[in-house]
């Protein structure tokens, strides 16, 4: 039995390919492929291209979300990969993200969300 409700990766990616960070169609495909890789269920994807550069996007999942915000001028991307349930693995999404953005360094904050005391959960 799960001792927590969800797994949440907060990702800091530096030294990314600036062209990939500014490629809105590529980012949308990366989000969709990330959802498939981690075993989640896609509800919808929304992206937005900024002028003169940069993008933001979110994949809304039945199990939570994957979100990205890019800064091509710094070679930087900030991402959240938050999944709930035993059947999902956010680290599988990270493999897809790494392949597309090609970061030179990655900082990962790995959170367990909805921690349950002794494996039980009670709403008050």
Curated annotation (Swiss-Prot):
Domain of life of the source: Archaea
Cofactor (UniProt): pyruvate
Pathway in which this enzyme or protein is active: Amine and polyamine biosynthesis; S-adenosylmethioninamine biosynthesis; S-adenosylmethioninamine from S-adenosyl-L-methionine: step 1/1
A biological-process GO annotation: spermidine biosynthetic process
Family membership noted in the UniProt record: Belongs to the prokaryotic AdoMetDC family. Type 1 subfamily.
Sample GO molecular function, one term: adenosylmethionine decarboxylase activity
Gene3D superfamilies tied to this protein: 3.30.160.750, S-adenosylmethionine decarboxylase domain (3.30.360.110)
GO CC, one annotated term: cytosol
The name this protein goes by in its record: S-adenosylmethionine decarboxylase proenzyme
Description of how activity is regulated: Competitively inhibited by methylglyoxal bis-guanylhydrazone. Inactivated by treatment with the imine reductant NaCNBH(3) only in the presence of substrate.
UniProt function note: Catalyzes the decarboxylation of S-adenosylmethionine to S-adenosylmethioninamine (dcAdoMet), the propylamine donor required for the synthesis of the polyamines spermine and spermidine from the diamine putrescine.
Lineage of source species: Archaea, Methanobacteriati, Methanobacteriota, Methanomada group, Methanococci
InterPro entries: AdoMetDC_C, AdoMetDC_fam_prok, AdoMetDC_N, S-AdoMet_deCO2ase_core, S-AdoMet_deCOase_pro-enz
Swiss-Prot/TrEMBL keywords: Autocatalytic cleavage, Decarboxylase, Lyase, Polyamine biosynthesis, Pyruvate, S-adenosyl-L-methionine, Schiff base, Spermidine biosynthesis, Zymogen
Temperature dependence: Optimum temperature is superior to 90 degrees Celsius. Thermostable. Retains full activity after 3 hours at 70 degrees Celsius.
Gene, per the UniProt record: speH
Modified residues (Pyruvic acid (Ser)): 64
Pfam families registered for this protein in UniProt: AdoMet_dc (PF02675)
pH dependence: Optimum pH is 6-8.
UniProt-listed Enzyme Commission number(s): 4.1.1.50
Cofactor note: Binds 1 pyruvoyl group covalently per subunit.
Active site residues according to the UniProt entry: 64, 69, 84
HAMAP family: AdoMetDC_1 (MF_00464)
Known partners and oligomeric status: Heterotetramer of two alpha and two beta chains arranged as a dimer of alpha/beta heterodimers.
Site (described: Cleavage (non-hydrolytic)): 63-64
Catalytic reactions of this protein: S-adenosyl-L-methionine + H(+) = S-adenosyl 3-(methylsulfanyl)propylamine + CO2
Coiled coil: none
Keyword S-adenosyl-L-methionine: yes
């Amino acid at each position: 039995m799960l001792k927590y409700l969800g797994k949440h990766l907060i990702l800091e990616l530096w030294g990314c390919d600036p062209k990939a960070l500014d490629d809105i169609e590529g980012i949308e495909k990366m989000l969709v492929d990330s959802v498939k890789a981690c075993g989640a269920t896609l509800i919808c994807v929304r992206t937005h291209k900024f002028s003169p550069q940069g993008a933001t996007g979110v994949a809304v999942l039945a199990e939570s979300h994957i979100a990205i915000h890019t800064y091509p001028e710094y070679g930087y991307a900030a991402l959240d990969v938050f999944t709930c349930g035993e059947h999902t693995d956010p680290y599988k999404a990270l493999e897809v993200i790494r392949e597309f953005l090609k970061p030179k360094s990655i900082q990962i904050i790995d959170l367990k969300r909805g921690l349950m005391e002794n494996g039980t959960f009670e709403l008050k």
